[in-house]
Amino acid sequence: TSCNAATGRSPGCFCNNDNNCRDTCCPRSDTEKKCTGGPDPCPPRQWPD
């Protein structure tokens, strides 16, 4: 699975783009901040390929 920070895989989620290719569920308003290397306090979720 490839990560894509521009498009989340489900509503309210976006690619955290870390080495584990995890999507992190956060409010959409947080997407820009977190996708540009901000701190990530949200619990990570694994999404299937």
Curated annotation (Swiss-Prot):
UniProt note on tissues of expression: Expressed by the venom duct.
Keywords: Disulfide bond, Ion channel impairing toxin, Neurotoxin, Secreted, Toxin
Top-level taxon: Eukaryota
GO cellular component: extracellular region
Subcellular localization: Secreted
Principal location: secreted
Signal peptide: none
UniProt PTM comment: Contains 4 disulfide bonds.
Ranges annotated as biased composition (Pro residues): 40-49
Domain notes for this protein: The cysteine framework is XII (C-C-C-C-CC-C-C).
Function comment: Acts as a neurotoxin by inhibiting an ion channel.
Protein's UniProt name: Turripeptide OL47
Organism for this UniProt entry: Iotyrris olangoensis (Sea snail)
